[in-house]
A protein has these predicted regions:
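Nucleotidyltransferase catalytic core that binds NTPs
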Residues: 1-140
Length: 140
């Protein structure tokens, strides 16, 4: 039996997605199985402040990429640090997160998935810088 769209839970996945990779895609696919997937995309200013990186792609381009993925219902601007007020305002039922955020506490149901091994935006950034100097093709 098909689930009625109006009965779907609002599922929030917060992401920086400074460099999109297959770990992000896998997380999006898994998260979307729990309901209507809403991605809270970290603002550029928060990436600079908290992660100490200037994103390779501006917020509007990262948003455009994420909105093109079929499992994504919508993408909303988000802060690096989520709080209960934000979840309530956006009517979130379930929070999905990677294991790197497992210590966060919310009133909502929280589902934590393990990270995809051997991949991260930081790792891609470091490999790209190293390989640019050597003029090699990036292999991950």
């Amino acid at each position: 039996m098909k689930t009625k769209k109006k009965n779907l839970k609002n599922v929030l996945l917060d992401m920086s997605c400074s460099i999109m990779h297959h770990g992000h895609v896998r997380l999006i696919k898994r998260a979307s199985k729990y309901g209507r997937l809403i991605i809270s995309l970290t603002l550029d200013k928060d990436l600079i402040k908290y992660k100490k990186i200037k994103p390779e792609l501006a917020f509007k381009y990262r948003k455009e990429i994420l909105q093109s993925i079929k499992n994504v219902h919508k993408v909303i601007p988000g802060r690096y640090i989520l709080d209960q007020k934000f979840l309530n305002k956006n009517k979130i039922d379930i929070v999905v997160q990677g294991s790197d955020y497992k210590n966060r506490q919310f009133k909502n149901k929280v589902i934590t998935f393990p990270r995809t091994l051997s991949i991260s935006s930081s790792k891609i950034r470091k490999l790209a810088a190293k390989n640019t100097l050597k003029k090699k093709i990036l292999k991950i």
